Amino acid sequence: MDVLSPGQGNNTTSPPAPFETGGNTSGISDVTFSYQVITSLLLGTLIFCAVLGNACVVAAIALERSLQNVANYLIGSLAVTDLMVSVLVLPMAALYQVLNKWTLGQVTCDLFIALDVLCCTSSILHLCAIALDRYWAITDPIDYVNKRTPRRAAALISLTWLIGFLISIPPMLGWRTPEDRSDPDACTISKDHGYTIYSTFGAFYIPLLLMLVLYGRIFRAARFRIRKTVKKVEKTGADTRHGASPAQQPKKSVNGESGSRNWRLGVESKAGGALCANGAVRQGDDGAALEVIEVHRVGNSKEHLPLPSEAGPTPCAPASFERKNERNAEAKRKMALARERKTVKTLGIIMGTFILCWLPFFIVALVLPFCESSCHMPTLLGAIINWLGYSNSLLNPVIYAYFNKDFQNAFKKIIKCKFCRQ
C-alpha cells in the first residue's frame, strides 16, 4: 500500500500511488539512469529476501510434522499472505517506483490497488489473529487446549481475508472521487474522505489497538505466573531455612490409616539436634530440635526405625543442606526473572516492528486527504514510508519463525536437503 508516488518534488503533478491523496505535491516523470539502477537493486534485493524468507516458512511447516499445529498454521498463513504481497504486489510497486510513473494501464492499476490493499490488510490482520490465539492460550490454557483446533484457525484466517476484501473492493464499486483517475501516469486509491477513514481504521488503527490490548494482557498474565513461581521458590527456601523441606513434610496425618504407607514423625532430639535421622532437623514450637524419623507401614502393624541413639550416630549437615537449597532457590529466581525479561523483549520486538513499519504510513495516509492544498511530502521521505510498510512482509517471518528453535531446525534440514533424502 503506497502512501505517496515514487517521485515528488519539482513543479509537475506527481503520480500518486495507492492511499495517496496527491495534495499540493509535485514531481518529475523523468529520472536518471543511476537512480533507476540503484533503486532496482535495493528493491529487487528486498523482494527476493521477502519471497525466500516466506517460502522457507511455508516449506518448513509443510515438510516438518512437529511444526504442524494450530499456532504454526496461523504463522504459515501469515507467510502465505506475505508471499502474495512479495510476488503479486511488490514487483509492480517497484516498477512504479523505478520509472516514477504508472505505465501499465488503468485496468492493471485497479487490480494492483485491490491486491495491494487486500494482501497488506490481511497480513496486518493475521498479526491480530496470532495475538488473539496467544492470548487465549496463556489466559485460558486448560479449556483452550480443546478449543484450539484447525477449524478455529481456519475461521480466524478466513476472517482476515474477509475483512481485507471488504476494505479493498469498495473503490472498484465506485467509492472514489472523480479526480482519482484524472492522471493517466498515476495509480491511486480513492481519496474520498469517508473511504480514507474507513480503510485506515479498518486496516490498521483498530487492529493496532486490539494488538496493544492483547499483548498487554499477555504480558500481565505471563508476569503474574512468573512472579507466582518466584514467590513459591522463595517460600520453599524459607521453609528449608526453618528445617522443613517439602520432601520431609508429612502428606497425611500421623494417624491417617487410609493415607500413604509412609509417615514421618518428629521426636525430641536427645542430642540437641547434633544427630538426625535421614539427614534433616527442624525446630519444634518450643525451640527444641526435632529429629525426623521414617515410619513404615507393614500390613496392619507399624515398624519403627530405631532412634539415632539406638542405631548409632548419624551425623548430618543442616547448614550445608540449607545453603544448597538457597542456591537452588536463587537459581530458580534468576531463571524466572530471565523469562520475564525474555517475554518483555519478545513482545517489544513484535509490537515495535509492527508500529515502526506501519504507523508512519497510516499517519500520512489518514492526514494527507484532508490537507491537499497545504501538505507537502519530500520525495525521499515518501519513498521510505511506502517501502517501510512493505518491508513488514520481509520482517514477519524473521520475528514469528526464525527466532523459533523448531523452525530453525527445520530450516537446517531444508538447507541440508534432508527432506529430499527422506
UniProtKB/Swiss-Prot annotation:
List every stretch annotated Disordered. 1-22, 235-262
Record Pfam families: 7tm_1
**Topology relative to the membrane:** Multi-pass membrane protein
Q: Motif DRY motif, which positions? A: 133-135
What are the annotated glycosylation sites? N10, N11, N24
Subunit structure, interactors included: Heterodimer; heterodimerizes with GPER1. Interacts with YIF1B. Interacts with GPR39 and GALR1.
What protein is this chain from? 5-hydroxytryptamine receptor 1A
